[in-house]
Amino acid sequence: MKHKTCVSITEKNPNKLNSVLKKALTKSEYAEIRLDFMKPSEIPIALQNVEKKLSKCVCTLRPKNEGGKFSGSEKERISILKLISEYNPFLLDIEFNTLRNNQKLREYVKKSKTPILVSWHDFKKTPNMKNLNLKLKNMKKLSNFVKIVTVAKSTNDTSRILSLYNKSSKIKLIA
């Protein structure tokens, strides 16, 4: 299996994003653009500035309650996620809970043909294997691209997360 790298970009200025992204893509195959670090009103400008490079980008608009920096309302975030999908990035990272609770968003993104990276984070612990397997099973229903991030406090925690790769033969897993 060939591994690919993805560098994360947290540029706050939409006019500087293109040059930062260009540099990042000389060092890595892909780049994650953390659009949640920008003001909501500047995200459309940022997307226009990097439109030609989005085929190599994972776009993320993470809300504060999921560890992100997005400063707008959830309604505004959903609207911006739809806009991002229209630009057809390589992947659009959307949280499991957001997708599970918003069928209209799922349908909209599906129509745009932008692949979804369904993500889930636990910033306090690594759940037990039964719960991790259940989470993976439920996430796989929403996308072939799944990202699970937890806090590992022991080698056992790390082993549980890494063992998910054995259960992910038909999906692309990031853990």
Segments (PLM) and residue ranges:
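Active-site-adjacent beta->alpha loops and helix N-cap segments on the catalytic face
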Residues: 37-52, 96-111, 127-130, 153-166
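Short, well-ordered coil/turn segments that N-cap beta-strands
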Residues: 2-5, 27-29, 53-57, 88-90, ...
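Structured C-terminal cap/extension of enzyme domains
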Residues: 19-22, 26-30, 159-163, 167-170
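Glycine/small-residue-rich loop that forms an oxyanion/phosphate-binding "nest" at active or ligand-binding sites
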Residues: 51, 57-102
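Catalytic beta/alpha-barrel core
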Residues: 8-10, 30-39, 60, 87-101, ...
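Histidine/lysine/aspartate-rich catalytic loop segments that bind and position anionic ligands
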Residues: 109-143
